[in-house]
Amino acid sequence: MNPNQKIITIGSASLGLVFLNVILHVVSITVTVLVLSNNVTGPNCNGTIIREYNGTVRIERITQWYNTNIIEYIERPSNEYYMSNTEPLCEAQGFAPFSKDNGIRIGSKGHVFVIREPFVSCSPLECRTFFLTQGSLLNDKHSNGTVKDRSPYRTLMSVEVGQSPNVYQARFEAVAWSATACHDGKKWMTVGVTGPDAQAVAVVHYGGVPVDVINSWAGNILRTQESSCTCIKGDCYWVMTDGPANRQAQYKIFKAKDGRIIGQTDVNFNGGHIEECSCYPNEGKVECVCRDNWTGTNRPVLVISPDLSYTVGYLCAGIPTDTPRGEDSQFTGSCTKPLGNQGYGIKGFGFRQGNDVWAGRTISRTSRSGFEIIKIRNGWTQNSKDQIRKQVIVDNLNWSGYSGSFTLPVELTKKGCLVPCFWVEMIRGKPEEITIWTSSSSIVMCGVDHKVASWSWHDGAILPFDIDKM
C-alpha cells in the first residue's frame, strides 16, 4: 500500500470502532431501562420514604421519581405526653462523672462566652447546660468588669450537656441575669429575670416563645433559682425571692402549665431566709435545698406539694453545708431555725435518701474552694453527725463555686426511679485571681449503684489570659 491507502484504511477502521462503541452504549441503556421497568422485586421508585431524625424538629419526606427527588419538609409534632416525674429518687452509692465542659481552657483560644451560674436540666431526649452569659467572649476587651451580677447584656443560653458555652453551638433562651429552666415532656420552659433592681421582670418562655410575666412585688432584686425548675405531670414549679439579701425577704412558689402561671403561694418563713433553691422531684413532690444568705450556715429545706401546700424548715443534719461556716464539731443542727450566725452564703444542694441525705459543700469553711459530697445517716430528719460516706469532686487547692441538683428522667434511663445528679461550678478570674474578667466552667456528676473514688475534676485553665496583660 502506498501511504495514502494506509491513512484511508486506518481512518476507516477508527470510524468503525467509534460507531460500534456508540451502538454498544445504546444497547446498554436500552437493556437497563427495560430491566428496571420490569423488576417487580426491586425498590419502588415511585414511593415515599419517611425518615425521622431525633436531632431535628422536622420529618424529611422524600418522594422519588426515578432520578428526581422532590423534598418536602413538614413540622414534626411535639411530644405527645407530659413527663410524670412522680417516681422516687434512686438510691446512690456514689456519683460518677457525667460531663465536663472545660469552657475556660477552650476559651483561651476559642469563641467561648464569659458566663456564670451554669446549671443542667433534662428533657425526655437530652440534657442541656444552661448558663448566664455576659454578652462577651473570653480573652476579649468586653470581658472587662464581668464580675458584676446584673447588666442589660446578660442572657440565658444553653448547649448540649458537655459542650463548652461556645458561640457556634449555643442556643438563645431568654434575656436574663437570673434564671431557671425545665422540660415538661413536651417543651422547654424558661424563666428569665431582667430589668432594673427596683422593677425587675421575670419573663416565662414556653417552647421558645414569651407566654407570661412576673413583676417584682417587693422592689428589691427579684431573683430565682439559678438551677433547674421541676415539672410533675405537666405542671412546673419554681421558687422566687424578692427583698434584702441580708435580712428578712419575701418568698413565693410559682406553678405553671404550658408556660402560663396557674398558681402561686407565699412562703411564710419569718426569721429564715431563702434564696437560690436547688430542687428536684421525689415521689410526686418537689424537694428543695436552698441558701440562707442572712444568718444560717445550715440550709433551708422547702417541700412543695402539687396543690402548692408546703413545709419549710432547715436541713436537720448536725453538719453545716453552707459557706462560710464554723467547725463541724461546734455545730449542733436544727430542723426549724437558722444556726451558725454567719452571713453571706453560696448556692448548694442536697438529696433525700429515705431519712438520710447526700449534701454537697465546699471543702474550705471560709472560701469557695474545693468541693465534696457527704452522706449523713438520718440527716434529713435528725441532728445527726453520722457521716457515712464522702466523695471529693474538686480538691481544696482549686476554686469551686455554686452547685445545684437535677434528675435524669426515666424516659432517658429506662429505670423505675429518678437518678439524682448535681453540677459544680468552678469560678475563675475576679475577685480571687488577677484578671479583668470573671467566668466559670462546670463538672456534672450522676448517682450510680457503686462507690466512686475521690479525685479533683478542677477547671485547670492557666491564667492570666492575653487580654489581662494588656
Curated annotation (Swiss-Prot):
InterPro entries: Glyco_hydro_34, Sialidase_sf. Substrate binds at R116, R150, E275, E276, R291, R368. Residues 1-14 are intravirion. One of its GO terms (biological process) is carbohydrate metabolic process. Residues 11-32 are annotated as: Involved in apical transport and lipid raft association. It is an enzyme of class 3 (hydrolase). It catalyses: Hydrolysis of alpha-(2->3)-, alpha-(2->6)-, alpha-(2->8)- glycosidic linkages of terminal sialic acid residues in oligosaccharides, glycoproteins, glycolipids, colominic acid and synthetic substrates. Its cofactor is Ca(2+). Its EC number is 3.2.1.18. Disulfide bonds join C90-C417, C122-C127, C182-C229, C231-C236, C277-C290, C279-C288, C316-C335, C421-C446. Ca(2+) binds at D292, G296, D322. The active site is at D149 (proton donor/acceptor), Y402 (nucleophile). Residues 89-470 are annotated as: Head of neuraminidase. It is a single-pass type II membrane protein. The chain crosses the membrane at residues 15-35. Belongs to the glycosyl hydrolase 34 family. Homotetramer. Intact N-terminus is essential for virion morphogenesis. Possesses two apical sorting signals, one in the ectodomain, which is likely to be a glycan, and the other in the transmembrane domain. The transmembrane domain also plays a role in lipid raft association. This is Neuraminidase. It comes from Influenza A virus (strain A/Equine/Sao Paulo/6/1969 H3N8). The lineage of its organism: Viruses, Riboviria, Orthornavirae, Negarnaviricota, Polyploviricotina.
